[in-house]
Amino acid sequence: MSDEEDIDESFEIEEDGISITDARGNSLKAQQIAGKERNLDPEADDLEVVVNFYEAGDGTFQLQLPKLTAVKPVDKVNDVLDFINFDKKVCDGIHSSIKLVSQRDQTGPAPFPKHKLTCAHCDWSFDNVMKLVRHRGVHKNVGVYMCQVCLTLFGHTYNLFMHWRTSCSQTSTTATDIEIQKAETPYLHRNVLNVLGSLNRASQYYCTGGYVFLPSDWCITNKEIVMEKDHMSSCHLCHLPVPNKFLEAHGNVHRGRFRIDGRIYGDYFCHICGTVFIEQDNLFKHWRLHCEEVIAYTPVDQYLSNTELATLAWLVLQTTISQADIECLRVSSSLITEKLAKEHAERHGIANSMHKYYHFPQEIWPLKTFVNLDLVNDAIPISGENSFKIKDPKRPVHIMNLLATACPGFYATGKTFNMICSTKKSESDTKKVYRVILRYTTEGSVIQSYDFTARSFPKLRVDSETPEGVFSHPLADFNVESNEAIVCHKCDSKKLTITFSTEVRLKYHLLRHSESRKDGYHCAICKIIVYNRSHEEHWINDCIPLQKLYRDQKDRECFDAEFAAKCASIIKKLRIRTLIRWKERANEDWVETKQTPDRIGEDFAIKFQVGTTALKTLMAGLEEHYKNAQARHEAYKYSEENFLPPLSTPVVVCFHCGTRCHYTLLHDHLDYCHYWPRNKRLVNEEFHKWKKNGCRNTWRVMKSVAEAMQIEVPFISEEQYSKILDYHTYFCNDTRYKVQDSINNWNDCSTIRDVDLSEKLSVAEIVQKGEDSVMAPEPDIIKNVYFPSARIITDNMLLRMTEINLNDVVQRDPITKEELTGKFKEVQDEQDAILFGDYRAVLRSKGIMVNSISDFVAPPDELAKAKASQESAGQESVDHRNRREREFIQQYMGKDLALEAAARENGRLVEVDEEAEDYELTPKELNARRLVERNRHREMCKTRCEHGEYDYEKFKARQVPINPAKMKERKYLTRVVHESGPDDDVCPDEPENNIIAFSPKYENSLSDFRISAIGFREKYLADDKKKRNGIPIRKMTEAQKGVALDYDTLMARHGGRPDVIMNPAGTVFVGGFVFDRKPTCQDNMQTVYVLRNGYAHRYRIYHCEDTNGIYKFVWPQEQSFDPDSLAKSARVRMVKQVKSPEHMIHHIEEIDESIGHNYRLNRKRRNSETREHELIELDTDDLNEPSTSDGRYSFGHHGYR
């Protein structure tokens, strides 16, 4: 019904003499309520409104209420309510009992039988560590429960109840033993009160229920009070278990009528996690250091004052209220009234229909009421006796529901009402109207006392109405919390429903629940039992040996489980003793034993007994492990500090609900509170699929909702939101936080390697003799350096052998045309897949119509056509070439076969296409041709097996003809050169010498790489089986440590044995590591050391001639590879060191001239003669091998590419 609808004219009530105005405020007359005169123009902080109830003609009940104008909250309010001086309300007999307690011996005789764990301070014994640790609180006097009958103290209520059942002389004799042992706790309380009544002491202790909690001085200043579950109820708004005496104040904190840091009955209560403190400073310290929810919303870059922290805590408390409960909160429902109303509804059997109406108006209990009715069990009758009671199933409406509907919202007007006055119903009233006066006031509001600033970020929420077509789910699913509470069944031993509003709260609760029941463990270094604390905290703060080794606490911040295990292992090998002496046992000396559970709580001293030599050895052995621990710690800090831009704040605001949190926790907040629908069953596959997508479209959806509903929400930028999700994905995929899978073989898990060419490819075209050769500008190949392009390798980019989909073609060697088998074919297929991709899809889209590298080699028919077009070159050069080739054939196949082959084409030997229709080779002729090609290739590759300086001229002899039809594809390969072989004693004008050969860069990236990688893996596996001991790690020099690689780290980082690669610039690529040269390191870069099982195995590195030591670079090989956290590329470093491009080119020339042309090609299996020149492990006698005199390092072939 409209608020502006007219009601009856003004009338008078004879008994009270109260004059009531109409709804419009017309004809206001002076009123007097309970002898108090009211002004015609009430002040803003005090207002009385008349509520009219009447029954309409159709039998429904209606209510009229005039509108209230919005009132601004007062500037200063008093936040001290009637929650103080609780101790004055307790009987004076408690204080007299405390005096008597100090004269009693509280430990008592030890129980029988004797258990294995004995207390260090008394004769009590226990059968497990948890009971012993709990018993220690008795000696500390942390706070005890006193029996009011015999004044005996107990540490826990359970022990007090057992005392009442068994040993209390007064209570145990009031009934039989069986009755007392089976009695419930309420019966025990009543039994104690009866005993106290018989002793004329019942009136003194009735308010405490038979026992008193006595906190000690230490407990008052340092410890929070733990409340028993028997005296707690769950808040219906945030579902927090709240002690009954704090329940009403907790509800007022929700409604903004009591400060969250206010004092309640002498205590300070954390309304977020339910912890009680004696001092306010401890409450603020708790919010800063221990309360998980407040810490999650606290900025890490700012220090909040106590006022700001209290504001932030209150806002965090408000985020625990669901959207539906906010509507109820606007009428400031009473928690105690809710509890009683639920019990009332259960008694009348209508508990399932309570959701149909508002249950609890604001401040009904314990406000002053002048209605003279029980607002809980009875109802105000309207138009008939008991016609408005809640137990009537046909009219499930209570008077409090109408009051709740009538009361204006506190957040809308700034007012609440604090008094209900009723007028007596007149018998002459025929319209069946009943009137109630509600007295509104702003007294008690503390909203303005909070410090709402940008630092405290008030929480904003979207409205409950959802625009059509935006969401497929109700907006309630995207709210902060679900409307239904989550029940914890683990701690509900007494069937007390402990509920939580969010999964995050339940998670923290279960974590604390499990930790409180976790047994102690021994520290492997100091042998002391560490109870209920993390390993890292103990190693950093309390471990005595580590404090002696690393005195500065900052040096111990990087300690982790891996470092502690290494430290304990080295201490054990060196036989360093850690001795313990128990101060309270004078007859015992220093002993080398672990602390036993029976000595928990005893004072002790630790002696770390180590000699000077052993100490130096220990520190030397820990040096490498300490550096690794520091590197792991710094890498973790670097990834957190440098992921977001430096100017951006790490604190972000959730665009759904306005929640303020650290950016690393935003994704978890979205997980638990917004994205995944609560009413949908959680399926692992769907959940991981959803999480993999990152929900990046949610930002746009929520922004459209805010714009459509005109809500001012502090949105973060879309770019920053994407960065946060990227960081969360990187953080979750970090290999340091995952268990490594089984190690795969090198060929089973390929890695994509991008080659970024600095210049485009230029080639020389083949022209006929007598014409000018047209050549593109071709600089010396030695000046060109390629740099691997670092990028993140994801699962989608990795190519495995099982996923490569190429045509089933026979893979042949590009030069000899021999069919490749075994591992060489696998490497060829893999490199083809990496270079050309899937032939059916990727190749056509990129314009590369090839299947493998072999397609770039000219087939015999194309070569024959090219040669036939050049017959005018001259008979003299033809005779010369034919004479050379006949000598080759005669050397291996005999003179007759050579002459016969020469006579086939008018005295000219040519290569014949096997598929040509006009000519067919006999088997002998075919074998002769193949043998000639095989022998020619063998002659060209002989230089790979030789030691010493590399002869660039010999490399030019390896001439590879390029298929003219594939010339347009050359830009996807690498640089090629146009040269003649040095061993060709031919005429300079002969056109046959103008053939194109593959460049050293091409051969290095595609040929030598696969051969050296396979060779490295075979040799490494072979050396692994020998298990030969190398150099002890502690005997390694600084230079040797500079080129050392830990074997376990290699396995953990890469999931398998890595390959070792070297590029033409001398950069060593070792398994995806940045191999930087240190300024203090005098390493000659001839070797690399692999650390395993305490020894360093030395391996020789070939073709590593970076004499200037300018740069080293990484070849990305990890899935979670982060290019920002690695060193800059070689190109960037080089540009920073030179002033101009000309200087840079000159600088590169100087580097490359010192390197030499150390490029080889070997696609065949190496025979037994060359196997000894592969990657070899050196003995310890070869450690002092001097470098070459000119400072350059020339080795054999098969360098690490």
UniProtKB/Swiss-Prot annotation:
An example Gene Ontology biological process: sex determination
SUPFAM superfamilies, per the entry: beta-beta-alpha zinc fingers (SSF57667)
Subcellular location: Nucleus; Chromosome
Reported consequences of knocking out the gene: In the TOR complex 2 mutant background rict-1, RNAi-mediated knockdown suppresses the growth delay and elevated body fat index.
Protein's UniProt keywords contain ATP-binding: no
Task of the protein: Embryonic transcription factor regulating downstream genes involved specifically in the sex determination and dosage compensation pathways, or regulating other genes involved in the coordinate control of both processes. Component of the SDC complex that functions in sex determination and in X chromosome dosage compensation specifically in hermaphrodite (XX) animals. Involved in the recruitment of the condensin I-like dosage compensation complex to the male sex-determining autosomal gene her-1, thereby contributing to its repression and initiating hermaphrodite sexual development.
Protein name: Zinc finger protein sdc-1
